[in-house]
Amino acid sequence: MQFLGPIDWIFVVLYLIVIAAVSVWSIRKSKETTSDYFLANRNLGWFVIGASILASNVGSEHIVGLAGSAAKSGTVLGHYELHSYIVLILGWVFVPFYLRSSVYTMPEFLERRFNPQSRRLLTIIQLISYVIAKASVTIFAGALVFNQFLGVDFWTGAIILVVVTGVYTVLGGLHAVMYTEAIQAIVLLLGSLVLMIFGLQEVGGWDALMQAVPKEKLNMFLPLSDPEFPWLGILIASPIVGLWYWCTDQHIVQRCLAAKNEQEARRGTIFAAFLKLMPFFIFLIPGLIAYALHAQGKIQLDDTNAAFPVMVKSIMPVGLRGVLAGGLLAALMSSLASVYNACSTLYTIDIYKKSHPEASEKQLVKVGRIATAVIVLLGMAWIPLMGRIDDGLYNYLQSVQSYLAPPIAAVFLLGVFFKRLNAQGAYSSMVIGFILGMAKLTLQIFQHDLTPGSFWHSFATMNFLYFCIYLFVFSIAVLVIVSLSTPPPPEEKTAGLTFSTTVAEDKAASRASWNAWDVALSVIVLVVILSIFAYFSPLGIAG
């Protein structure tokens, strides 16, 4: 159903014109080198980095999924939206090692620290993860939103946006992606903030909302008996997924690799950590508002997945609806562009360049563009398949990530802290962990064909949070045992890539890159997170 008026369409068209203009400007500015195309010539400041990190994270699955999940399950999935502390870990722990190694990709860093086999394996895992956990979900959710907002045929709208996003990504590389992302982040956040404000006014204010929503929906720490989100499971598993996503995933870390220097990269992550606090309120809280308005009889909410667009349709005035439409277009285009560029970088640097070391700069850029075009086509091919995904896209996304994250998070985290860990341990941990994770996902998909009570059925239906924890511990055990059972890594594999092997000169340079303000701002982020946890717990509003 179409509910945008002429004024709304003016906002949508103006937004698209601005994005097109920025893309053309960045394309003309591009220098046609791999450093420029894939890492924006390593010349970006903290504001663009921070805004781009958030824009890369916030996709249409957030708009459709998070608000819908809040309307259905309450605030418990807010754990994943309060990962600002993990973003700080990226800036304070991992960024110095990544920048000193001057790598283009995360698999390349893994080769520096371990061996080429680890690099190749991580490349394959990351490319698979982009298909099953990022691009496909984003395309499906974005197409759904596009249909509900603009009244355009579901598949037609998806194809148009996927192609438009692919064109400016192919032509402009990371320059086009990051500068348009900075704009899109602002549009998306402001539009969603306006919706939350109007929603609170409609429901009667914050206190009225807290009274209208049952206490169990306001509790972020559900009982251990909860079948989906027991507090112990989500409290431990959520940071594991966060470490993988924020600290080792190509399409997030790539923003930091494009920084002018370590100071700009770290401050970009601090800025992103502040921005990351906002989705909890502007995406999750509207879901609670939709639940409350439905309970009050003010809106009709037959499908919780439609919570966000139903609110826009019901309570937003003409004109501002266009702002939200622009924000949702921004979310879809930003996430897809980020995935396209990350996949292009992974393929070109970690696969093509390894087999064609003599390739020129222009040839690599050309291959990158071709790779992006292929990814665009694969994304379009996935659209019909996404119709088979059950409701609850956000839940699906988190469960898939819980099966992919543990071994990679273990290898990266322990790899920078302990120099004794070697390539054999890292490779074994990732191979075994990946096989177990994919086995869990496959059996879960076909669980209805398994005999209830059997081992395989029990394995398939195991809570995804607990499975994530078990797999993380098991991956660490494999990593440590195999490493200690084999010779230590050669010195060149650890020099400057672990805390104990960082030379004094690098330590001094890293220390000079931050000051008391950086520390104070980071502490403020942590205090805000703890305050939110306390408020939405049995000690606070849910008590």
Please describe what each predicted stretch is.
Residues 1-543:
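Membrane-embedded helix-loop-helix hairpins and adjacent transmembrane boundary segments
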